Swiss-Prot record:
HAMAP family: PSII_PsbK (MF_00441). One of its GO terms (biological process) is photosynthesis. It is found in: Plastid, Chloroplast thylakoid membrane. The gene is psbK. One of the components of the core complex of photosystem II (PSII). PSII is a light-driven water:plastoquinone oxidoreductase that uses light energy to abstract electrons from H(2)O, generating O(2) and a proton gradient subsequently used for ATP formation. It consists of a core antenna complex that captures photons, and an electron transfer chain that converts photonic excitation into a charge separation. It is a single-pass membrane protein. Pfam families: PsbK (PF02533). Keywords: Chloroplast, Membrane, Photosynthesis, Photosystem II, Plastid, Reaction center, Thylakoid, Transmembrane, Transmembrane helix. The chain crosses the membrane at residues 25-45. Belongs to the PsbK family. PSII is composed of 1 copy each of membrane proteins PsbA, PsbB, PsbC, PsbD, PsbE, PsbF, PsbH, PsbI, PsbJ, PsbK, PsbL, PsbM, PsbT, PsbY, PsbZ, Psb30/Ycf12, at least 3 peripheral proteins of the oxygen-evolving complex and a large number of cofactors. It forms dimeric complexes. GO terms for cellular component: chloroplast thylakoid membrane; photosystem II reaction center. This is Photosystem II reaction center protein K. Its main location: plastid.
């Protein structure tokens, strides 16, 4: 019988108390690569997709 315990995954998803002030920044960090991807299209539009 396979016993999977997912409580460790839940605990790892929460920042320790010492890093609580950085929580809003951590929420935004995954969006940054998407912004760079969109910036590439803006850049290519600026140079007329050469």
């Amino acid at each position: 019988m396979l016993n999977l315990n997912f409580t460790n995954i839940t605990v790892m998803g929460i920042l320790p108390e010492a890093y609580a002030p950085f929580d809003p920044i951590v929420d935004i960090l995954p969006i940054i690569p998407i912004l760079f991807f969109l910036l590439a299209f803006v850049w290519q539009a600026a140079v007329k997709f050469r």
